[in-house]
Amino acid sequence: MKFLKVALIFSALSGVYADLEHNLRIHNDIPVEYDSDAASADIGSEDEPHQQEPKIANFLIEYDVLEEDGRISSGLIEVENGKSLSFSYNFTNSEDADVNVYAFGGSIIDMGSSQIIADIPRTDFSPVHVAINESARLLQKLPIDLPEGILYVLPHIYVDKDGEQMKVGASPISIQVVPPPLSIFNPQFLSIQLFLLGLVAAISYYVFGFSFKTTKQPVKKQNRASNSNEWLPETHIK
């Protein structure tokens, strides 16, 4: 009897082992794709987080606005719409290699909303070579055709370093855009002048014309009467 129980247990264990071996063979037939690059990246990310450090451009950009005569007490530069601002740059290269400066650009920012309301179109010019620790003078003309108010001007300078193109921003300035003075030759102003002159002429004719007629007629009759009496004898004058 004991032998029969042992035989049954042994047969059950043999079936479980055979089923387990069959399952293992089936799973071993499944191909597994292994990405060594991804694995190494995952391992690297687990050991030390990957952080991309921002590049810092070693350039010194200083500039003057040649129209600073329009600077008012609050520090703003007042400029009329339709005029231009001239930026005189002093660009210093503190990088470890020579660079070429080849374009201007920038943005116009509204002071109230801090939103970009206009872009300064990129203006390319012949590349200016600037060696290490050397400086170069650059001049930019910025036509002003903007909404009136207080705005920020953020200039950009485009630099090429060993084939790598960079856009470097300079410190912003604040400007106040005002309307241009109204010229006497402005068509709108001339039309207003003509309208006012016509209005004054019409009023003058209406007021002085009627008063002149009412005062002039009796004078004419009196003159005629006096002239006619001078030629009559005194006996006929009544």
From Swiss-Prot:
Lineage: Eukaryota, Fungi, Dikarya, Ascomycota, Saccharomycotina
Compartments, record wording: Endoplasmic reticulum membrane
Lumenal topological intervals: 19-191
Transmembrane segments: 192-212
Pfam family, one: TRAP_alpha
Membrane topology recorded in Swiss-Prot or TrEMBL: Single-pass type I membrane protein
Name of the gene this protein is made from: IRC22
Stretches for region Disordered: 219-238
Name of the protein in its database record: Increased recombination centers protein 22
Keywords: Endoplasmic reticulum, Membrane, Signal, Transmembrane, Transmembrane helix
Species of provenance: Kluyveromyces lactis (strain ATCC 8585 / CBS 2359 / DSM 70799 / NBRC 1267 / NRRL Y-1140 / WM37) (Yeast)
Disulfide bridge map: none
Role of this protein: Is probably involved in a pathway contributing to genomic integrity.
Keyword Endoplasmic reticulum in record: yes
Sequence similarity: Belongs to the IRC22 family.
Entry GO terms, CC: endoplasmic reticulum membrane
Signal sequence, start to end: 1-18
Cytoplasmic side: 213-238
